[in-house]
């Protein structure tokens, strides 16, 4: 199957890239990095994000959104990753997704138009830190309409107008400035975001009426897809910058990029990044279309993207030589963002374990047959997963 962006998605991609190139480049990112006490949410950027419809991409038209779907949202996420762009775009989009998936008509009418327009900002707390991306790992407990628990590493909680919190009985809306809510800023390695610990002590929670384990799992999968696309955006930018630099960096009287060992390594990295891009884009399509292999596609995409981004940003630092290790160079922006997102909504090991479970379940159910000519492998989005091993590796021809 040939899968590619349609014309609307390509136009969106060009528009996002153009804005970030011309109006919010790496120097603007550096200004956020150099102001760790600030809120990490530049007003000019939020205005553009709101006005250009990047927040409305998943909100249905009947609620003042544009309803372009998860592939279009992934296009935006990929561009934001490439630019290491700060701000609560992801949290706001996921808050809107929670309301869209599980909210009542009244809840949708109240929140979706405001979130789509950027009039309200969102933050989400869906998992305990380090836990696998499953509904049973909710960070809060609900009791009679109130929530308790410590929510760790919540991005942009300080500027949010609404928190979406997962508890054992589903998703809840919480007023960040309400009684029983204490928000404490945390020091972050990656200064392209702001994180906080949110303590809930009997805080009022408005349950999203259609919450269920299935809905929470879908929200977690959608979050993982967007993070995977952010990671492949980081990886592609790291590879591109490295190739351009090594064309001009001279050692032993010639550009280092002309040495065979470096050329071969960067060629291999290009293949890996391309595979990760295809896997992440296909996962977005599979989830949006409700395909049977959607869960498998999500875990392949997230694990592959995390591994590839880690390799790409590490190589970026190494192949830039001494300057790549300095604060003045932007390589550490990408490295720190990739490291943070590597663990968001399930790390590579957790997603490979999920891949293994899904493939074993299929095999037990007879859906994979006896392995046959493919040697017990299945292919999703151009990336092959070995049956029962949970390993996502390689690309099919």
Region locations from a protein language model:
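Alpha-helical interface subdomain recognition
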Residues: 1-83, 114, 118, 221-397
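Short, exposed beta-strand "edge-strand" segments with a Pro/Gly-rich flavor and a Y/T-containing core
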Residues: 1-5, 17-24, 64-68, 87, ...
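Glycine-rich flavin
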Residues: 25-162, 166-184, 356-359
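FAD-binding core of flavoproteins
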Residues: 106, 113-240, 244, 362, ...
């Amino acid at each position: 199957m040939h899968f590619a962006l349609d014309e609307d998605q390509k136009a969106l991609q060009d528009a996002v890239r153009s804005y970030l190139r011309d109006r919010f480049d790496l120097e603007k990112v550096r200004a956020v990095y150099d102001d760790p006490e600030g809120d990490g949410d530049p007003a000019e950027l939020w205005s553009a994000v709101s006005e250009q419809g990047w927040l409305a991409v998943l909100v249905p038209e009947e609620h003042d959104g544009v309803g372009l779907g998860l592939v279009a949202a992934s296009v935006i996420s990929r561009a934001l990753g490439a630019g290491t762009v700060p701000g609560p775009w992801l949290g706001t989009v996921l808050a809107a997704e929670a309301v869209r998936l599980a909210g009542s008509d009244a809840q949708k009418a109240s929140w979706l138009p405001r979130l789509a327009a950027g009039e309200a900002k969102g933050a989400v707390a869906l998992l305990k830190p380090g836990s696998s991306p499953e509904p049973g790992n909710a960070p809060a407990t609900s009791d009679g309409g109130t929530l308790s628990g410590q929510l760790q590493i919540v991005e942009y909680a300080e500027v949010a107008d609404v928190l979406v919190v997962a508890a054992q009985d589903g998703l809840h809306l919480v007023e960040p400035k309400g009684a029983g809510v204490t928000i404490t800023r945390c020091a972050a390695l990656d200064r392209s975001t702001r994180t906080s610990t949110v303590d809930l002590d009997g805080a009022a929670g408005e349950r999203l009426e259609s919450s269920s384990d299935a809905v929470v799992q879908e929200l977690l999968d959608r979050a993982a897809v967007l993070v995977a696309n952010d990671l492949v955006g980081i990886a592609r930018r790291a590879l591109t910058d490295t190739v351009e630099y090594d064309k001009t960096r001279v050692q032993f009287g010639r550009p280092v990029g002309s040495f065979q060992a470096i050329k071969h390594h960067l060629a291999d990295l290009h293949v890996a990044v391309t595979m990760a891009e295809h896997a992440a884009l296909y996962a977005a399509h599979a989830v949006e279309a409700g395909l049977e292999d959607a869960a498998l596609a999500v875990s392949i995409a997230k694990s592959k993207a995390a591994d590839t981004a880690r390799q790409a940003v590490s190589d970026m630092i190494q192949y830039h030589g001494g300057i790549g290790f300095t604060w003045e160079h932007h390589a550490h922006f990408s490295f720190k963002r990739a490291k943070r997102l590597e663990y968001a909504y399930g790390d590579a090991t957790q997603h490979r374990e999920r891949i293994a479970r899904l493939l074993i379940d299929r095999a037990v159910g007879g859906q994979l047959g006896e392995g046959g000519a493919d040697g017990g492998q299945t292919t999703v989005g151009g990336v092959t997963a070995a049956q029962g091993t949970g390993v996502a590796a390689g690309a099919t021809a």
